Design a protein with these regions (language model features):
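Short acidic, glycine-rich loop/turn motifs
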Residues: 38-42, 87-94
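Contiguous beta-strand/loop segments that form the cofactor/metal-binding neighborhood of enzyme cores
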Residues: 1-79, 108-122, 139-142, 159-161
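Short polybasic amphipathic segments
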Residues: 62, 78-92
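C-terminal helical cap and adjacent loop that interface with cofactors, partners, or active-site loops
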Residues: 91-161
Length: 161
């Protein structure tokens, strides 16, 4: 469930609110694989996939393909203390850029921001309770879609994952 939460949260942060999903689950060779077609409030379409357990150096991330360029991002296990890799491709000038994150260890930065919000009252710039609820609603919709084999609107879901 935690991995699904991360996948849903990534998509919501990158493309906006998810309104509906159509999902399937495949269980083979000791792996569980979710494949999810996603509809966003903006009208954009997306695809989520999650495989557990993978036979490789695990990472999570996202890929966005647009009219004027693309972004590919990878985030690694937090215990590696490794910055995320973000590549930006710009159609306008045919360039490729890799963002260097000298201080980009995401997990440490999230913990520091959380502690700062609690200890000093700093504004929360990370996910909040509404983001968490939207992520859980997305996971419930994915579970219901796997069960029914059909499209599920997030606004219509209730119950546990």
């Amino acid at each position: 469930v935690g991995d699904r939460a991360a996948v849903v949260a990534h998509e919501a942060a990158n493309a906006g609110d998810i309104t509906a999903v159509t999902a399937r689950l495949s269980e083979r060779g000791g792996m569980r694989c979710w494949f999810v077609d996603v509809e966003f409030a903006s009208g954009a379409l997306g695809h989520l996939d999650l495989a557990v357990a993978v036979r490789m150096d695990w990472h999570e991330g996202f890929e966005v393909y647009g009219e004027k360029g693309s972004i590919v991002a990878k985030t690694f296990n937090p215990w590696y203390y490794k910055s995320s890799e973000v590549d930006i491709f710009r159609e306008a000038d045919g360039s490729t850029h890799r963002v260097l994150g000298a201080d980009g260890h995401f997990y440490r930065r999230q913990l520091e921001a959380f502690a700062d919000a609690i200890l000093t009252g700093a504004p929360n710039e990370a996910a909040d309770i509404e983001d968490g609820l939207a992520s859980v609603r997305g996971m419930v919709a994915i579970a219901r879609s796997v069960e029914t084999g059909g499209r599920v609107a997030l606004a219509d879901v209730t119950g546990a994952v």
